[in-house]
């Protein structure tokens, strides 16, 4: 299973650790989207910036097409 993560709010007024977490996920601008594996480490990162992102589950079959 994979997760599609979309940055929906700005990083301007966020704490440094939240900005670094978003950058580690590959999110730098509003409406950036990344697809990551569903792992505990990614869940921890999402929890840190949960108020800034929208997360959707994506099945692996959609990724292969």
Curated annotation (Swiss-Prot):
Q: What family is this protein classified in?
A: Belongs to the universal ribosomal protein uL30 family.
A GO cellular component annotated for this chain's UniProt record is: cytosolic large ribosomal subunit
A GO molecular function annotation here is: structural constituent of ribosome
User: Record's InterPro entries?
Assistant: Ribo_uL30_ferredoxin-like_sf, Ribosomal_uL30_bac-type, Ribosomal_uL30_ferredoxin-like
What gene is behind this protein?
rpmD
| Coiled coil start-end | none
Q: Which Pfam families match?
A: Ribosomal_L30
Q: Name the chain's protein.
A: Large ribosomal subunit protein uL30
Q: Does the keyword Ligase apply?
A: no
Signal peptide coordinates: none
Q: Which biological process terms from the Gene Ontology are attached to this UniProt entry?
A: translation
Q: Which keywords does this Swiss-Prot/TrEMBL entry list?
A: Ribonucleoprotein, Ribosomal protein
Q: How does it assemble?
A: Part of the 50S ribosomal subunit.
Give the top-rank taxon of the lineage listed in the UniProt record for this protein: Bacteria
